[in-house]
Amino acid sequence: EMTSSLVGSEMCIRDRSWLLYNFLSGAMIQLDEENKSIYEQILQDDAYASEKALLTENGFLVDYDELAFIRVANKRACADKKTLSLLIAPTMGCNFSCPYCFEYHRAGVMSKEVQDQIIQFISDSVKKNHHEHIFVYWFGGEPLLAADIIESMADRIMTIANSNGIQHTSAVVTNGYLLSEKILRMLEKHCVERIQVTLDGVGQINDASRMLHNGEGTFETIMENLSRRTTINIVVRSNISKRNMEHYGELYSYLVDFNKKYGTNLTLYPARMEVYHNSKTGKDEKLSQEEFFKYLGERGFLSTQKINDAKFVSCTAERFHSYAFDEKGNVYRCWNDVGNELMSFSTVDQLLRDNGKVKTRNIVPYLDNGYQFDDECLRCKLLPVCMGGCIMKRNFMKERTCTPIKFHTDDFVLRKFFKESDTSKGGEIHDADC
């Protein structure tokens, strides 16, 4: 028996014109007043065969359990072997003292022994699972404090990829302070396609929360480093809190002018400042989801973000072939856990022994995501593009993290409609996709 899709959205886009959007199939259908009337009658009427066929083809009418389909798709996506996804922290040390930082900083860098074990693990996994792609996220701490280790390990990973005829790409999360000309060119040569640098505002606004250990500011040095042209896509993340939210527009304008002046192509990404149990920042500075997305939406800062296709995974943490390594060789699922040895589920040495001991309590919550959706998620039309949000926050912090589309659904759907109708144009600086 045919029923209406649980993940379809209906909205009026102009006088006597309606738009249907399906978050599972990604299909859009525009209806005039006559067809809207047919659409409302179609389930009760055996006529309209061609109209029913169109709606069925695009997912607006279904004869199967969509939630069961999403769960099955989630399991298949999590087990997919195409990409071996790795986060590697060559050091957990850092040269900054950011009060909101969630990371577990400590001195020291990755030993040669641990480096060798990780490289051996990558080589073994490629041979065993026939991966088509190795993706590495260089993380920390501040990873560029160990740039020599990145260079050495990246050389060896490139050799593995080349000898097996597969693709290798990587990205770096850095505070940008050490992103010198020499290091930037080294990263270009080692398959780095994306660098994320955080700025919390312009000048002193940034320096109030992102400073060196001696309290000195960092903004000028970071911007000097970002002025260099590069083939790497550089994303500027801005952690927005009650303290700096009114200065986000200033940063946006500053980067537009900066791109024009230096011929760069910096991309801006607004992020809600998070407060973790090991953060020094008080919860009173944190914006709620509603406050955060309302602020961005009312000021047009979501205008270049777009709707994701159905992805069936919330993040790489729930993929079977995804691993995060700290400098000691501890292995984690979530990069927010890296350095917190209590959340490690194994060590690289144990993984190499194949049947090594695994701490089940630290891995099951990430690998069983599809069966942990609560009633609100199960009722939400956005489930296919959100998949329940951050697993770590939901399971360990009992906090919901929703997509911004939830708070501005009509705006997102309309932008997609007008873009695909070739009636909208991009701006000079773009926000990252949600």
Q: What are the roles of these predicted feature ranges?
A:
Residues 1-8, 13:
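Single conserved hydrophobic/aromatic residue that forms the stacking wall/gate
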Residues 14-30, 49-87, 129:
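N-terminal [4Fe-4S]-dependent radical SAM core
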Residues 75-104, 119, 123, 128-137, ...:
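N-terminal pre-triad scaffold of radical SAM enzymes
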Residues 101-113, 338-341, 383-414:
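Iron-sulfur (Fe-S) cluster-binding segments and ferredoxin-like electron-carrier domains
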Residues 119, 123-137, 146-273:
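Radical SAM/AdoMet-radical enzyme domain recognition
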Residues 121-140, 402-434:
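Short Fe-S-cluster ligation motifs
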Residues 204-209, 265-286, 308-315, 338-348:
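Flexible glycine/acidic-rich beta-alpha junction loops that bind and position SAM and/or redox cofactors
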Residues 284-310, 336-387:
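C-terminal accessory region of radical SAM enzymes
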